[in-house]
UniProtKB/Swiss-Prot annotation:
Stretches for region Disordered: 119-220, 250-360, 372-503
Subcellular location: Nucleus
Function: Promotes transcriptional elongation by Su(Tpl)/ELL. Essential for development.
Xref: Pfam families: EAF
UniProt keyword Acyltransferase, yes or no: no
Database matches in InterPro entries: EAF_fam (IPR027093), Tscrpt_elong_fac_Eaf_N (IPR019194)
Gene Ontology terms: cellular component: nucleoplasm; super elongation complex
Family stated for the protein in its record: Belongs to the EAF family.
GO BP terms, alphabetized: cellular response to heat; positive regulation of DNA-templated transcription; transcription elongation by RNA polymerase II
Native source organism of the sequence: Drosophila sechellia (Fruit fly)
Nucleus as UniProt keyword: yes
PANTHER family, per database record: ELL-ASSOCIATED FACTOR EAF (PTHR15970:SF2)
Keywords attached to this entry: Activator, Developmental protein, Nucleus, Phosphoprotein, Transcription, Transcription regulation
Protein name, UniProt field: Ell-associated factor Eaf
Length: 503
């Protein structure tokens, strides 16, 4: 049935009748045949410009590469069309040949199956792009073939003349690929973020400086001392610091002496320890000059101008007077000393006070004896002169002489009294300055050898001497003469003597 259908279809197509015909085997079935072969060629595209009147050429190269050249018509402008492809052998395929003249049908074996494609620029570009895309590069490659000649690269196994062109084009593409890859890497390195570790570790780039908010302000902890006044720290071995500080304290000494302070205060050994803050004085808000007594064992006693951490100090006459008033009116307070050397100064001051008190007591006793002798002499002279007629005038003269003598004695008495008062006033100021010092010292202060009881006894002795001196000075009149009681007694004696003369 199938043969009938095939014959029917074949008979219809070849216009052969339904009669039976003889089938012959061709020369290809003969094993000794070497001259006859049948091949099939399959084209992908057949242009209309192909000239069928002329013969085409088939070139079989190595590795089963086949090039087919088909001539074109002269009117097309292109001499021929080139096809390239490959071939493979047939195994069981046959070819039936029908001869219209004789009506004989011959069967022949097929040898090779050839499949070719037209060599176009587009096709060649696609064939070249495939290896380029595998390499990561898609740049187009221009072929040298334009249809008039064979294209250099499209089908493997082509002629030896076109093979070097394929290799050269491939090498050019690989070179361009390497250059583009390097440029991309350079761009990636150039556009890295600022915080990238590769950029920070790169030797070619400068190391970025990270500014924190703590270092942004202009105020710096290290530079903060530059705005403060220079406050030298004085120790036991720092003799040069004391000498340098003496120049800064010259103005304070002159202002203190101009305000009426004794010279002993201006030349006393007092220095201010650095890093000491000033406490507010009694709530009145005025700045008060603070001194601290210091006696290093190997350094001379000098005075240093105090500085209060950047506050301006304007030492004038009015300020010195206010300073003295505050020191006089402030209650005495016991302050620890900054060094242990104050014991020597306190003992020296107590010895000086004892010697002064003894000298004053001796002067007072001698003065009392002189006063007693003068009084007894005046009374005896007044009694002896009462019998004379001129006793009144003589007594008046003697009284005046006695007054002048007594005035001289009073002057002699007032001189040690003034010396004692000056010394006492100096001791009070030194003691007051010692008490008005700040308690919070950063140099390891120790308490003095004498206690509060010794200070109280010292103050009581000073008060007793002052009271005695006031009593002794109160005996005399304000004009330096004898008191009113002695004058009245003298007048009574003179009047009695005059009455006796009249009788």
């Amino acid at each position: 049935m199938m043969m009938t259908k095939q014959k029917n279809s074949l008979a219809e197509r070849l216009n052969i009748g339904e009669e039976a015909r003889e089938l012959k085997l061709g020369a290809t079935f003969n094993p000794k045949n070497t001259s006859t072969a049948f091949h099939t060629i399959k084209y992908d595209f057949k242009p209309a410009s192909v000239d069928t009147s002329r013969m085409a050429s088939v070139d079989v190269g190595s590795n089963n590469q086949v090039t087919v050249t088909v001539p074109n018509s002269e009117s097309s402008g292109v001499p021929h069309t080139v096809y390239k492809g490959n071939q493979r052998e047939y195994a069981k395929e046959c070819l039936m040949i029908y001869d219209k003249e004789t009506g004989a049908i011959t069967i022949e074996k097929l040898n090779h199956n050839i499949q070719v494609k037209k060599t176009r620029n587009e096709v060649s570009n696609k064939s070249v792009q495939l290896p380029g895309q595998n390499m990561g590069q898609g740049q187009p490659h221009n072929q040298g073939a334009n249809g008039a000649g064979p294209a250099p690269t499209s089908v493997p196994g082509q002629g030896s003349g076109t093979a070097p062109k394929m290799e050269n084009s491939t090498m050019r593409i690989s070179t361009k690929t390497k250059v583009s890859t390097g440029s991309r890497r350079n761009n990636i390195i150039d556009f890295k973020p600022r915080n990238s570790p590769m950029q920070q570790n790169s030797p070619s780039r400068p190391v970025p400086v990270h500014r924190s908010p703590q270092s942004a302000p202009a105020w710096d902890a290290n530079n903060a001392q530059q705005t403060l006044p220079s406050i030298p720290l004085i120790t036991d071995d720092d003799d040069f610091g004391l000498r340098a500080a003496l120049h800064n304290s010259g103005h304070a000494n002159r202002s203190g002496s101009a305000a009426g302070q004794p010279d002993f205060v201006s030349t006393s050994s007092s220095t201010h320890i650095g890093k000491q803050r000033q406490a507010p004085p009694h709530g009145h808000g005025k700045r008060q000059q603070m001194h601290q007594r210091l006696s290093p064992p190997m350094a001379q006693q000098q005075q240093q101008h105090p500085s209060n951490y950047g506050r301006g100090y304007n030492g004038g006459h009015n300020h010195a007077q206010q300073q003295q008033q505050q020191q006089r009116n402030s209650p005495p307070r016991q302050r620890p000393s900054a060094y242990g050397h104050d014991n020597t100064m306190d003992v020296d001051s107590s010895r000086e006070h004892e010697l002064t008190s003894q000298s004053v007591a001796q002067a007072a006793a001698a003065l009392e004896q002189q006063i007693g002798g003068v009084l007894s002499a005046s009374s005896s002279s007044s009694e002896s002169d009462s019998s004379d007629s001129d006793s009144g005038s003589d007594s008046d003269d003697s009284t005046e002489d006695d007054r002048s003598t007594q005035g001289q004695q009073q002057d002699h008495q007032q001189q040690p009294h003034q010396v004692y008062q000056n010394h006492n006033h100096t001791q009070q100021q030194v003691t007051q300055q010692h008490h008005n010092q700040l308690p919070n010292l950063g140099l390891g202060s120790i308490s003095p050898a004498y206690g509060s009881n010794h200070q109280q006894q010292h103050q009581q002795q000073m008060l007793q001497h002052q009271q005695k001196q006031k009593q002794q000075s109160g005996i005399y009149a304000s004009n330096g003469g004898f008191p009113n009681d002695f004058l009245q007694n003298d007048l009574q004696l003179s009047s009695n003597s005059s009455d006796d003369d009249d009788d």
